[in-house]
């Protein structure tokens, strides 16, 4: 089963854009089709973005975070990454390394430029959905 890390932007799109590719990606994890991993740092950044950019109140933010925490394995990475200037991007890489993820799914150009980090592929949502479908098609 694919081990996946979602960047904060994927969660934001999944929760704010119904019927989007991001929601489709998240629903694969909800349905147990992939193993989703996240960290407290990623969830903290998500809460901040939902409050500041989308004016979500604390109750709505907490509901989203609780849902993610039920779907994903929340880890506390024991590694420190300082590869990129944006510290939030480094937190994504730390989570990927600590969880031995197969893929980071993101729309962030700084992460996408890397293409791969420590054995973990870095891809856009559409490519992730294609990879998932292709991987499962070959099992039939």
What are these regions (language model features)?
Residues 53-56, 122-123:
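Short, hinge-like loop/turn segments at secondary-structure boundaries
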């Amino acid at each position: 089963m694919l081990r996946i890390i979602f960047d904060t932007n994927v969660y934001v799109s999944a929760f704010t854009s119904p019927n989007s590719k991001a929601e489709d990606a998240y629903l694969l994890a909800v349905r147990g089709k992939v193993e989703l991993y996240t960290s407290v740092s990623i969830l903290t950044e998500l809460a901040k973005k939902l409050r500041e950019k989308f004016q979500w109140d604390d109750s709505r933010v907490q509901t989203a975070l609780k849902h993610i925490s039920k779907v994903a394995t929340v880890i506390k990475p024991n590694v420190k990454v300082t590869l990129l200037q944006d510290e939030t991007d480094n937190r994504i890489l730390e989570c990927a390394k600590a969880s031995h993820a197969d893929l980071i799914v993101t729309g962030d150009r700084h992460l996408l430029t890397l293409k791969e980090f420590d054995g973990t592929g870095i891809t856009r949502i559409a490519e992730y959905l294609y990879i998932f479908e292709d991987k499962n098609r070959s099992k039939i």
